[in-house]
């Protein structure tokens, strides 16, 4: 039996493509590429990164351990990765007009955890928006670490219009005296009055944290109000509207607080940072500093308004009556359709969305009465108002078909709409 020499094996290790070494995984990746190319991505938390971001994240920096911070590493050989992290930090500070940035958190959830570790002790009271009202798991939801380790108090939205209930927030803050107040969420589509929340935080002696994961790109472009002048600390993901790699980041104008946060991220919560991801963050932040990024964010927000208006014209309700950002929460009850059924039917028509509870939702969390939609990914590939009017009509057509179906069989409508979706996507190709 002929055996390859060790040198030949080493050469293959460094040069053989994935399709040759692991065809099953290569096929799965190819399938996902096809889904992204041939479908309309409407999940509000997803976007499409540039070739440059992909290149940085897939670079040799994945091989390098770099515990610590630039100039203060616990490993040698960090000169190049120090440059990458320093670029990411400098660009983040310029982008958001802040004095401090930590770009090492692996995710938005870990960025939030690092802030908790820096500012809180187990059992402290925190006040955040409830998940049912549009908040995030990490803001005190019962199943999450934030709801288990802390005395989590939750504020919500007003029943009459779905907007943030500032009076409830202020009342709970005065009654419960939280150590930390959190603003921001995962399914809240309106501007937030950060100055008003900071005022009550100061009144009760609380830290004020804003999780701007969803609207960070809009903040960077000056389209959504910036929380940076008002919050003690701001967290974000680096994907979503910011259009970078999946990761997290923490910002502040308080340098003393920044020292606590640095210690909380490393060595408190994480070990080695993901230097290939940090390099990709630097690329994305550089892209966001260019004039075309502001134009993209402006288009993203305008497209969201057009999509919401088209859905209303089609007989659907939008929670809060519209949107100030990239996302909207669609109430499906006028069509007598569940979020679970809508998500599945839309996906069969090559449109990806996610079922989502609406405020005061009577349906179970696994079923829901709504879907959440967003415009970041389709705007990235070039969709404008005309295309989003088409998308809105496609969605209404699928939901009307689902509503009219007694047995849930919407195959004919899904096929007809799916063909139109494929035709539209072919006009706006990605990763050719």
Swiss-Prot record:
Alphabetical GO biological process terms: glycine biosynthetic process from serine; tetrahydrofolate interconversion
List cellular component terms (GO): cytosol
Q: What is this protein called?
A: Serine hydroxymethyltransferase
| GO MF entry, a single one | glycine hydroxymethyltransferase activity
Location relative to the cell = Cytoplasm
What the protein does comes down to: Catalyzes the reversible interconversion of serine and glycine with tetrahydrofolate (THF) serving as the one-carbon carrier. This reaction serves as the major source of one-carbon groups required for the biosynthesis of purines, thymidylate, methionine, and other important biomolecules. Also exhibits THF-independent aldolase activity toward beta-hydroxyamino acids, producing glycine and aldehydes, via a retro-aldol mechanism.
Instruction: Provide the residue positions that the database annotates as binding (6S)-5,6,7,8-tetrahydrofolate.
Output: 131, 135-137
Fetch the Gene3D superfamilies from UniProt.
Aspartate Aminotransferase, domain 1, Type I PLP-dependent aspartate aminotransferase-like (Major domain)
Origin organism of this chain?
A: Acidiphilium cryptum (strain JF-5)
Q: How does it assemble?
A: Homodimer.
Broad class of enzyme this protein falls into: transferase
Q: Which cofactor does it need?
A: pyridoxal 5'-phosphate
